[in-house]
Amino acid sequence: MPFDCPAPPSRAACRTVFLSDLHLGAMGSRADLLLACLQARPADIYVLVGDILDLWQPLLPHWTAADQAVIDHLNARAAAGADLVYVRGNHDPEPDRAPPHARLHVRAVCEHIHRTGDQRRLLVVHGDSVDSRLVRTHLATRIGSLANHLLLRLDRGLRRLVEIGRAHV
């Protein structure tokens, strides 16, 4: 499926960009597409709404150059004066414990009040914070995350086999 992220009419066109559930470091992350979009649309404020990093797979890391480029881009934007707000998610409850190269230079919070251009106030939280814990336990969530990782790895391997088969036909 093609991805199109056209540049805005002016470089100041984006006041705020909200990013959620990027899962950088997970097998299914599409950091390459995200980076292209972030580079095309600079913003004054970046609100990172949880699960930016996927810190649940310490034994199965999948950190790519594209994942690192997204982190480097956001840190560079912050160094240039953009505001970065990091709202914790369930996959990154302690982002400051990420490996040094994967850390964003920002303080992580559980919730954030965002003020819009017309001064309305919006509460920003990660969706997992309001999920019902009666239906889903922490252990079940961890098992589901591991199963997802393994299925993505299997899918990637099968796709490679199909490509190899096509090349030999």
State the predicted function of each range.
Residues R15-H23, R121-D128:
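Active-site-proximal beta-strand elements of phosphoester/diester hydrolases
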Residues S10, S20, S29, S129-S132, ...:
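Generic serine detector
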Residues A102-E111, D118-L123, D128, S132-A140:
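Conserved beta-sheet core of the metallophosphoesterase superfamily
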Residues P2-F3, P9-R15, L24-D118:
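Core catalytic region of metal-dependent phosphoesterases/phosphodiesterases
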Residues V125-R166:
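Active-site-proximal loop/helix segment associated with metal-binding centers of metalloenzymes
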